[in-house]
């Protein structure tokens, strides 16, 4: 008779580790430890811990809850007082953004006069050249890029409108234009 072993991948034996719990977290304790390689505060590299966000250094899980001593598996976690919400990890998230991320630009709301001017040029040509765009941008008081994007979006709206008209004309058939075939 073959015997099968069931392996629970979620179970972690936490009683093996000695957890030192201090009432206040110490900033820079990990980076000041001798033999530490790397820089920055711990936990800023994302969830690289395969043990479900358990941090054995300060006895806290990734949600800010305390790790219970020993046990695991199906045991209910003991309720421990939660740290105040303004922790260094939260302050680090609100800090300066990475250099490669550009701030999101706000949507430009053109005035009625600006839209009228853009529409009049659009009726003349849907693809204005660079000098025309520059002059138009200077007259309107916006950047050339904003003008270029406006023309690009306007062309897309016109194409969509043309497609809608074509579909509407296909659906609306004139009974006089239809051919009826009667089969006996």
UniProtKB/Swiss-Prot annotation:
GO terms for biological process: androgen receptor signaling pathway; positive regulation of gene expression; regulation of DNA-templated transcription; regulation of transcription by RNA polymerase II. PROSITE patterns: HOMEOBOX_1 (PS00027), HOMEOBOX_2 (PS50071). Keywords: DNA-binding, Homeobox, Nucleus, Transcription, Transcription regulation. It comes from the Eukaryota. Signal peptide: none annotated. GO terms for cellular component: chromatin; cytosol; nucleoplasm; nucleus. Induction: By androgen. Residues 26-104 are annotated as: Disordered. One of its GO terms (molecular function) is DNA-binding transcription factor activity, RNA polymerase II-specific. A motif (Nuclear localization signal) lies at residues 155-164. Changing residue 156 to V: Found in a man with severe oligozoospermia; uncertain significance. It is found in: Nucleus. Mutagenesis of amino acids 147 to 164 and 155 to 164 lead to a major cytoplasmic localization, with only minor localization in the nucleus. Does not interact with itself. Transcription factor maybe involved in reproductive processes. Modulates expression of target genes encoding proteins involved in processes relevant to spermatogenesis. This is Rhox homeobox family member 1.
């Amino acid at each position: 008779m073959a015997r099968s072993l069931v392996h629970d991948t979620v179970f972690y034996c936490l009683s093996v580790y000695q957890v030192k719990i201090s009432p206040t977290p110490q900033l820079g304790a990990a980076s000041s430890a001798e033999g530490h390689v790397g820089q920055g505060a711990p936990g800023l590299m994302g969830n690289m811990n395969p043990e479900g966000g358990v941090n054995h250094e300060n006895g806290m899980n990734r949600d800010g809850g305390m790790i219970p001593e020993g046990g695991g598996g199906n045991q209910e976690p003991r309720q421990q007082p939660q740290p105040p919400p303004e922790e260094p990890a939260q302050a680090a998230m609100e800090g300066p953004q990475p250099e490669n991320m550009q701030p999101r630009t706000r949507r430009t709301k053109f005035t009625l006069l600006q839209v009228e001017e853009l529409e009049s040029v659009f009726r003349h040509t849907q693809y204005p050249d660079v000098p025309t765009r520059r002059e138009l941008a200077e007259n309107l008081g916006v950047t050339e890029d904003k003008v270029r994007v406006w023309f690009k979006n306007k062309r897309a709206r016109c194409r969509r409108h043309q497609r809608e008209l074509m579909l509407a004309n296909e659906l609306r058939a004139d009974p006089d234009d239809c051919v009826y075939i009667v089969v006996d």
